[in-house]
């Protein structure tokens, strides 16, 4: 009977996917400027930017306000697709980890489901989209006609032509490690905070207020950046580099990049851009979960609260 009850009360994966896609659109529009600043700081090897505020003001002063939304199209598209896949695949993985007797998912199952969803999104969506986004964001100046890449599609075509299709998957290894770890921690923590703070259990028909979802999402999104900082820096460096005139590249892979950055710039450089990540990821999770929880909450209220047992 317990299993039958749980199956009646379960939110289907497609609804999780829809909720994630809507949350991704809102998050992208709100937080793109922070992502641009983070990328510029991580690519700054000569100290051109003195910090977040200086970087942002310099970008606006030298390139215009619109420059803070450079790469928005691939960023918004990538976030929407990423959250659709993340939320949907995580729900499917959790179904596989459900206890056959109680129908519940353990913290271990939740952690592994999140890691699997993070790995899947990293390989299928995040890596190629972030390669294009970072290449666009690193272009500096006020004259677009002088840019190497004219837009997302032109950028992708140029990378494929000059570096082969594999160029779109530059930095795949650190991206997999970053996203897998981030989502494992995030999904586990979000569920724990919902229960601890609001006594909210999935399938109970209770809809969290947006501010409650934002608090849980914000707290759940804080741990990842500290754990995955080096992977994010290495990912950005690998994605930003292109082959020189002789066909060579600066970083040969994830391990070589970590060693090179540590040797040339010091240990702290592996956490460069941490503050803007903390300014972007926890608020991003707060925004995304505020939207996603409303969508799934309405579904619970309409279809699950009075579902027959």
Swiss-Prot record:
Topology class, membrane: Multi-pass membrane protein
GO biological process, one term: alpha-ketoglutarate transport
InterPro entries tied to this protein: Mitochondrial_sb/sol_carrier, Mt_carrier_dom_sf, TXTP-like
Keywords on record: Membrane, Mitochondrion, Mitochondrion inner membrane, Repeat, Transmembrane, Transmembrane helix, Transport
Pfam families: Mito_carr
Entries under PROSITE patterns matching the protein: SOLCAR
Gene3D superfamilies per record: Mitochondrial carrier domain
Top-level lineage group: Eukaryota
Location in or out of the cell: Mitochondrion inner membrane
Primary role: May transport cytoplasmic succinate, derived from fatty acid oxidation, into the mitochondrial matrix in exchange of fumarate during lipid mobilization in seed germination. Conversion of seed-reserved triacylglycerols into sucrose is necessary for growth before the onset of photosynthesis and involves fatty acid beta-oxidation, the glyoxylate cycle and gluconeogenesis.
Family: Belongs to the mitochondrial carrier (TC 2.A.29) family.
Record's protein name: Mitochondrial succinate-fumarate transporter 1
Species annotation: Arabidopsis thaliana
């Amino acid at each position: 009977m317990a299993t039958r009850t749980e199956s009646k009360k379960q939110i289907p994966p497609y609804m999780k996917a829809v909720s994630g896609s809507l949350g991704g659109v809102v998050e992208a529009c709100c937080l793109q400027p922070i992502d641009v600043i983070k990328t510029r700081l991580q690519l700054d090897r000569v100290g051109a930017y003195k910090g977040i505020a200086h970087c942002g003001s310099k970008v606006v002063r030298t390139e215009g306000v619109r420059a803070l939304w450079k790469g928005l199209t691939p960023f918004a598209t990538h976030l929407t697709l990423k959250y659709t896949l993340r939320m949907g695949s995580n729900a499917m993985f959790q179904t596989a980890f459900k206890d056959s007797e109680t129908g519940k998912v353990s913290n271990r199952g939740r952690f592994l489901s999140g890691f699997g969803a993070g790995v899947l999104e990293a390989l299928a969506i995040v890596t190629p989209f972030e390669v294009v986004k970072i290449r666009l964001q690193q272009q500096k100046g006020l004259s677009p006609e002088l840019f190497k890449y004219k837009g997302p599609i032109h950028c992708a075509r140029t990378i494929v032509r000059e570096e082969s299709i594999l160029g779109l998957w530059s930095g795949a290894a650190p991206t997999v490690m970053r996203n897998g770890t981030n989502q494992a921690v995030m999904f586990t923590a979000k569920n724990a905070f919902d229960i601890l703070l609001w006594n909210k259990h999935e399938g109970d028909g209770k809809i969290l207020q947006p501010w409650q979802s934002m608090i849980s999402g914000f707290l759940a999104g804080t741990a990842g950046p500290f754990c995955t900082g080096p992977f994010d820096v290495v990912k950005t460096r690998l994605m930003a580099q292109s082959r020189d005139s002789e066909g060579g590249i600066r970083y040969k892979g994830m391990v070589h990049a970590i060693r090179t950055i540590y040797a040339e710039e010091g240990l702290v450089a592996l956490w460069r851009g941490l503050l803007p990540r903390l300014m972007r990821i926890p608020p991003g999770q707060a925004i995304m979960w505020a939207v996603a929880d409303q969508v799934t909450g309405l579904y619970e209220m309409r279809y699950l609260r009075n579902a027959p047992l």
